């Protein structure tokens, strides 16, 4: 892309060269006078020019908004004294592009209207909060406007490269160009940084309640845009106003974020504290005031200090009582733990002796029970065989044999009861002894209690079946008996 130079009566190659007649370079009495020239150049070319760097309010570097463009201007202070700031860095309100002196007068008029609107709203009882915020913004704007002074020169261009490498047709439209200049207007013309800083330092956190739409309408930024860039009322439609408000919101958010990163805006405000936190801050703040300063305070503040001091003493007493209660409870708990540990030691020794005795008794009882169960098992088997042999005596059995069978059954039942009682007594003895869980488990695994109990259940069920069958046979025998009435008289005596 070939380089081209936009034709302008001031911003050209001859700006850095001395005048042939006077042998001096063209100078600008103030920094705002230089910004008047830059603003006109931007407006005609639709190409934003930005302040790229500055040093001690004496040296400034301006460049095209496109990084690849070689356009560059170096502006330096020429004079013995400089009424501006001598600190390093860009001057306050000069990190963007500047504005004209005529727009500065409009800027003051806008602030006056804003202050009057703030006072009018302050008289409205239904909008106390809105009026307070508006008044705070108006006061901050007025303070910044009164404290700012014009940076005096003279300033001269020491170096200029007036060529662009992008075509003029690719530059911005008028509305987009105006939107790109909103940060410069906020920073230079309206001193928006100082306004936001004043609002951030407000105890009521006014910056959080800042209404951008109200600021756009009342700050004078619309008047500056109309006068400087020639926008008509039709061009300042709702979409344009919305885009302007969006630029203001972005600028405000970036400023507050920078303050938070620097740690200046990191402290919580009074309305953000909870009740407990608020009292805690006051609780630590007022006792730190020396006594001789407290006597110099007003009477109301002295009462507040004394009240919070009493609250502090009461809280300390409550903490001491709570600590003593906790300590006493802790001592009782420690003593209880010590006694429990002593009892556990003695119980462990007793448990060892008991386990030895129980193990020996369990072994002896298991051996005796095993021999007894073997003997009882043999008796039960023999009895079961006898009962099974007697099952053939169901019908037609004489009375003597039936009685003998009943006596045998009773004997078997009695033997069954005795065996059951012995087993239950042995189980109760085993349950009365406090045997270790492992010993009891091993004994249950090795003892034949389960087999014996199963045999007893089988025998009991078998006896019930035999008894039921016997009852059936008795009924049948009764039916087969011939009544005495039906017997012939000659046979009754037989």
UniProtKB/Swiss-Prot annotation:
Which superkingdom is the protein from? Eukaryota
Q: Where is this chain compositionally biased, Basic and acidic residues type?
A: 319-328
One Pfam family, short name: BAF1_ABF1
InterPro entries per the UniProt record, alphabetical: BAF1_ABF1
Record's keyword annotation contains Aminoacyl-tRNA synthetase: no
What does UniProt give as GO cellular component? nucleus
* Basic residues bias locations: 281-295
Q: Where in the cell is it found?
A: Nucleus
Family according to the record: Belongs to the ABF1 family.
Kindly provide the name given to this protein in its UniProt entry.
ARS-binding factor 1
Q: Which organism is it from?
A: Kluyveromyces lactis (strain ATCC 8585 / CBS 2359 / DSM 70799 / NBRC 1267 / NRRL Y-1140 / WM37) (Yeast)
List the top taxonomic levels of the source: Eukaryota, Fungi, Dikarya, Ascomycota, Saccharomycotina
